[in-house]
């Protein structure tokens, strides 16, 4: 029996509000995170991902309080990311009620941090988030590079090699966002999703670019993703989670109804 594919609404939170941007800029407000999370919990989302996109020092306390409030209302797995830099940060978020933490820039800065995190808390709690951008020219073999700091800082690191290294270090899941597709609504970058899904032994969550329900199906069937993450199609009422699940099931994708 194949494992059911997961639908994960994503809350990008900036200064205590859910927002949605295009290619990491051009932000619009999508509501109060606790209310938004409750709505998805009621709709039957499989998980929720909460990414603190400001994640500045002054924002941390607010984030912890928001995570506590969400965890009190929501009974599906909650992943929290943004500004997770130390083992203490991980402990704080897990104690606040997160089930998993997502590590991005801190992993690039110190890959051993991922190893220590997986050893300390278990791989099942550790998600490594990868923001990948295509850097190969037309006609060259496709190549994607890791960017950090909300997609602003190039690292020179190959995305596929990095995904393999991170799973070797104990990451239990890869959250893959295509920087080229983020917010565009024209579908996932299926090539990089497939390349990473084929390269690593852990689940891959596809993110960046969902504009319709067919894109979710494509992410799973063509991209090989184990889970699909979406924000604006759910936040702004274009589709509901049950509609997405029904659509996917009708097209032969195993989902939890």
Swiss-Prot record:
Catalytic activity from the UniProt record: 5-[(5-phospho-1-deoxy-D-ribulos-1-ylimino)methylamino]-1-(5-phospho-beta-D-ribosyl)imidazole-4-carboxamide + L-glutamine = D-erythro-1-(imidazol-4-yl)glycerol 3-phosphate + 5-amino-1-(5-phospho-beta-D-ribosyl)imidazole-4-carboxamide + L-glutamate + H(+)
Gene3D superfamilies recorded: Aldolase class I
CDD domains registered for this protein in UniProt: HisF
An example Gene Ontology CC term for this record: cytoplasm
Gene Ontology biological process terms in this record: L-histidine biosynthetic process
Subcellular location: Cytoplasm
Documented EC number(s): 4.3.2.10
Active-site residues from the entry: 12, 131
Keywords annotated in UniProt: Amino-acid biosynthesis, Cytoplasm, Histidine biosynthesis, Lyase
HAMAP family: HisF
Family, per entry: Belongs to the HisA/HisF family.
PANTHER family according to UniProt: IMIDAZOLE GLYCEROL PHOSPHATE SYNTHASE HISHF, IMIDAZOLE GLYCEROL PHOSPHATE SYNTHASE SUBUNIT HISF/H IGP SYNTHASE SUBUNIT HISF/H
Protein known as: Imidazole glycerol phosphate synthase subunit HisF
Lineage of producing organism: Bacteria, Pseudomonadati, Pseudomonadota, Gammaproteobacteria, Cellvibrionales
């Amino acid at each position: 029996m194949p494992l059911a594919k997961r639908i994960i609404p994503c809350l990008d939170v900036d200064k205590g509000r859910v927002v949605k941007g295009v290619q990491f800029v051009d932000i619009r407000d999508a509501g109060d995170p606790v209310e938004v999370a409750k709505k998805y919990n009621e709709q039957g989302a499989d998980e929720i991902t909460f990414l603190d996109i400001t994640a500045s020092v002054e924002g941390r306390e607010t984030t912890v309080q928001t995570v506590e409030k969400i965890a009190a209302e929501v009974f599906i797995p909650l992943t929290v990311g943004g500004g997770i830099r130390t083992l203490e940060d991980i402990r704080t978020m897990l104690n606040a009620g997160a089930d998993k933490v997502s590590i991005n820039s801190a992993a690039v800065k110190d890959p051993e941090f991922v190893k220590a995190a997986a050893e300390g808390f278990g791989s099942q709690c550790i998600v490594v988030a990868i923001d990948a951008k295509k850097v190969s020219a037309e006609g060259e073999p496709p190549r994607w590079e890791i960017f950090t700091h909300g997609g602003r800082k190039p690292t020179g690191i190959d995305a596929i090699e990095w995904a393999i290294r991170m799973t070797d270090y104990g990451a239990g899941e890869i959250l893959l966002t295509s920087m080229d597709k983020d917010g565009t609504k024209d579908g996932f970058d299926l090539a990089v999703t497939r390349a990473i899904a084929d390269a690593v032994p852990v689940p891959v969550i596809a993110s960046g670019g969902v504009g319709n329900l067919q894109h979710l199906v494509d992410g799973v069937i063509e991209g090989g993703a184990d889970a699909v993450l979406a924000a604006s199609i759910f936040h702004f009422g274009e589709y509901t989670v049950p509609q997405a699940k029904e659509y996917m099931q009708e097209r032969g994708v195993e989902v939890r109804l």
